[in-house]
Amino acid sequence: MIVVKRGKEPNSLLQFRKKNPDADYEDMPSSVRADVREQMWNEQKHLCAYCMRRIDNPSDVRIEHCRPRHPKDEVVHDKKATLDFKWMLGVCYGNSLVKGVKPEDMTCDAHRRNKELAINPFDEVSVRKIKYKADGSIYSEDAEINKDVTDTLNLNCPALSLPQTRKKVLLQAQKRIVQKCEGKSQGAYIHELERTYKS
């Protein structure tokens, strides 16, 4: 999972909210959605906020709401909050477009549905509680966050080879670091590890 840093909302979304103060997400025009997708795609460096898979085009971005649009308690549901850009995430389709896909083979918001999340993708402290194993699987020692990544979002889904893909990326990064730091001090090696971790 990546830490999402939201910039200023697209102007088209701001104007839509101003002109339509009682609107919610369902009322958003397709042109505004396209602007939202494109901005999130760029801000997230073309990665799904949850599984970190590459998203090839802005049109392939699914607009996810970190806070569910239809929570169980509709009484306290604030429909205007569904247009709040700071709570929107760009995610992949989580294998949901595959015909006949089983629910256990879906990931990200396709698997999440309307469940609340303990993890906050906008909070670095929260995201840093996710740990990576050598086999590419992820977990957290925080029980609620662990439930989010392993069950609610299904981020260790074997159907999409998510752990194997992470392992491959990890091995590539390790190889690059070793090559870059060959013959250098331990401090240089640690510095490169930190730089890679933060990127």
Q: Across the structure, where does each feature detected by a protein language model lie?
A:
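C-terminal, charged low-complexity interaction regions
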Residues: 144-199
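Histidine-centered nuclease catalytic patch
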Residues: 53-106
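Intrinsically disordered, low-complexity boundary segments flanking structured domains
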Residues: 49-53, 74-79, 113-121, 125-126
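Short, charged surface segments at domain edges that flank catalytic/cofactor-binding sites
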Residues: 3-50, 72-83
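A structural signal for short, well-ordered beta-strand segments and their strand-loop junctions
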Residues: 49-50, 62, 90-91, 129-132, ...
